[in-house]
A protein has these predicted regions:
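Active-site Asp-x-Gly
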Residues: 168-208
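Activation segment
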Residues: 53, 98, 163, 172, ...
Length: 266
């Protein structure tokens, strides 16, 4: 352990679940968490994800992740324990031997990623997710009619990026279910398209990969067009609000490329 890790009170909170501690290795993932780490311990190892116990979206996302976990295992690592006090809220997941996926052109990981995304699309919507309506793209839609195309009864993972797909020996997991929602089933494959274009694929190639997901095949092309337009407006808005964030400008360019490919209104 090192000085950047939480103090003794944090580890005392975890002790009933971990037993005696060994090494603690911070992970590169977890940009929205106060701590993500592999904790070597008497009862582990565990992947530990922790946030300060303050009211708001970040705390709520951890609670949502805990609530959805039983319904997404074995596509996600199982949650083994939870701990909470006035200062911290902590989740302990089964640690898996895996690495982040590679989305670049020619990556051997893409078959596994698309296969897993297809399996996620087949999951039934759990009761806990009934009230988690997907609305993030609604205000960027042309109108209420287009926004209604994003509605649906599918369980959406929505946080599609290479670091959230973990490639193991003969297994692939989707991790960081921080903000699952209920919406139109095509949205997850559409988010994959955006990420693949960002990784260097042409829009045509990216959509060919998405076409391996039944939810994409079954989607109304007009709904996908409306989403591509809204997605571009969303990233354009984000980039305008944070002009120094080069990655947001890059995502705007990516979204523009895909929208242009579809001939979608911008």
């Amino acid at each position: 352990m090192n000085d950047s890790l939480p103090g003794a009170g944090f580890w005392a909170l975890l002790n009933p679940h971990t037993g005696d501690l060994g090494d603690v290795h911070r992970t590169a993932r977890g940009f929205s968490s106060d701590l993500t780490a592999i904790v070597e311990c008497e009862k582990g190892p565990f992947f530990v994800k922790a946030m300060r116990n303050r009211l708001g979206g970040r705390r709520d996302s951890l609670i949502r992740e805990a609530r959805v976990n039983p319904f997404v295992v074995p596509l996600a690592p199982p949650l083994k324990w939870q701990a909470e006090n006035d200062e911290w809220i902590v989740l302990g997941f089964e640690a898996v031997e895996a690495r982040g996926a590679k989305f670049d052109v020619g990556s051997p990981d893409l078959r596994a990623v698309v296969g897993l995304l297809g399996r996620i699309g087949e999951l039934p919507l759990p009761g806990v997710a009934e009230g988690w309506a997907e609305t993030r793209w609604n205000r960027f839609a042309d109108d209420a009619v287009d926004a209604a195309l994003f509605e649906g009864g599918a369980l959406l993972y929505s946080d599609i990026n290479p670091s959230n797909f973990m490639i193991g020996e003969g297994r692939t997991w989707a991790v960081d279910w921080s903000w699952p929602t209920r919406g139109a089933a095509f949205i997850d494959p559409a988010c994959l398209v955006v990420q693949l274009v960002a990784a260097g694929h042409s829009p045509e190639d990216a959509e060919a990969w998405a076409g391996r997901c039944p939810a994409w095949v079954d989607a109304d092309p007009r709904a996908i067009d409306a989403f591509a337009s809204a997605n571009l407006r969303m990233y354009r808005s984000f980039a305008e609000r944070r002009p120094d964030a080069a990655w947001l400008k890059a995502m705007e360019t990516t979204a523009r490329s895909w929208a242009a490919h579809r001939g979608a209104a911008v």
